[in-house]
Amino acid sequence: MPRSVNAVASKKHRKKILNFAKGFYGARSKLYTVAKNAVEKSFKYSYFGRKNKKRNFRKLWIKRINAAARENGISYSNLIFLIRKNNIKLNRKCLADLAMKNNSSFKKMIKKFQILYLDL
């Protein structure tokens, strides 16, 4: 009885891995075993990259809010405190966008808070 090998599926799988490895340098894009390791590692890095992207954007938003708040004479932590006290449902992304694109309304918002809470 001849040896049964599923060559079609094996070839398809190898081709899929080599397609993922397109653009990699040298053997990483040509040889299956090397490409398999490179693709696996790249998937791992892309997974962590997606998590880091969220972290980095949050940091950026906080820096932008802090810079805009300090221009108006209030610290970031006090601004967040005042926003929470007034039950304003704006997240950091919206606040950063407001501070960058519509600075005049951001200033008005801060002035209103400072009038309400003069002790800060």
Curated annotation (Swiss-Prot):
List each coiled-coil range.
none
NCBIfam families, from UniProt? rplT_bact (TIGR01032)
Q: Which GO BP terms, alphabetically?
A: ribosomal large subunit assembly; translation
UniProt record similarity statement: Belongs to the bacterial ribosomal protein bL20 family.
The entry lists its GO molecular-function terms as:
rRNA binding; structural constituent of ribosome
Matches recorded under CDD domains: Ribosomal_L20
Q: What are the alphabetically sorted keywords of the record?
A: Ribonucleoprotein, Ribosomal protein, RNA-binding, rRNA-binding
* A GO-annotated cellular component: ribonucleoprotein complex
The entry's protein name is: Large ribosomal subunit protein bL20
Q: Does the record carry Ribosomal protein as a key word?
A: yes
* Membrane-spanning intervals of the chain: none
Name its species: Karelsulcia muelleri (strain GWSS) (Sulcia muelleri)
Tell me where on the tree of life, at the top rank, the source sits.
Bacteria
The UniProt record lists the keyword Signal: no
Q: What is the role of this chain?
A: Binds directly to 23S ribosomal RNA and is necessary for the in vitro assembly process of the 50S ribosomal subunit. It is not involved in the protein synthesizing functions of that subunit.
